């Protein structure tokens, strides 16, 4: 067996980065991920983003492809529509679809990110936290990352970024 394994360096271990790490690792890629924030499994999830995330069929399809749909949907809450409150005190439900087959689901963003991080590591991805991208030289295939805990620079080589 030769050295045919494709390598990818990802910057960002949020929802998209973690999901991509899972999908590529499952397909035999050697994936290394660098994330600016600390590990949310250690210090808790901190983000300025909304607490919950609305998950539609397209998102469920991506989770299904990664083998994560069942675990995530076990904690999801169905949302059939939005409630409109009139000035006169009336309330009207505006459904997202025709029936309960056309709904969106509410999931906790932090819990979803942690589940995806854990799955990415289980599939073989390596994740480095506290590494903020500073500079990239695509021609040389190098990048400089800064550790936010001590402002030290770390130079890496990458095949694909």
Q: How would you describe each model-predicted region?
A:
Residues 2-7, 56-161:
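Conserved N-terminal helical subregion
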Residues 48-50, 102:
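Short, solvent-exposed beta-strand edge segments and adjacent coil->beta transition regions
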Residues 14:
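Glycine-rich NAD(P) Rossmann-fold beta1-alpha1 loop
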Residues 11, 25-48:
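Glycine-rich FAD pyrophosphate-binding loop
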Residues 17-18:
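N-terminal Rossmann-fold NAD(P) dinucleotide-binding loop
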């Amino acid at each position: 067996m030769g050295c045919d394994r494709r390598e990818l360096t990802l910057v960002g271990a949020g929802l998209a980065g973690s999901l991509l790490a899972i999908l590529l690792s499952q397909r035999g890629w050697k994936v290394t991920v660098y994330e600016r924030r600390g590990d949310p499994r250690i210090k808790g999830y901190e983000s300025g983003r909304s607490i919950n995330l609305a998950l539609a069929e397209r998102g469920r399809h991506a989770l299904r492809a990664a083998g994560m749909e069942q675990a995530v949907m076990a904690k999801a809450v169905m949302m059939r529509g939005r409630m409109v409150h009139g000035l006169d005190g009336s309330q009207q439900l505006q459904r997202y679809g025709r029936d309960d087959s056309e709904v969106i689901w509410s999931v906790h963003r932090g819990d979803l990110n942690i589940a995806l991080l854990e799955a990415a590591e289980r599939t073989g991805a390596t994740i480095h936290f506290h590494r903020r991208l500073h500079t990239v030289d695509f021609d040389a295939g190098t990048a400089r990352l800064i550790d936010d805990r001590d402002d030290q620079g770390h130079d890496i080589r990458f095949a694909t970024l």
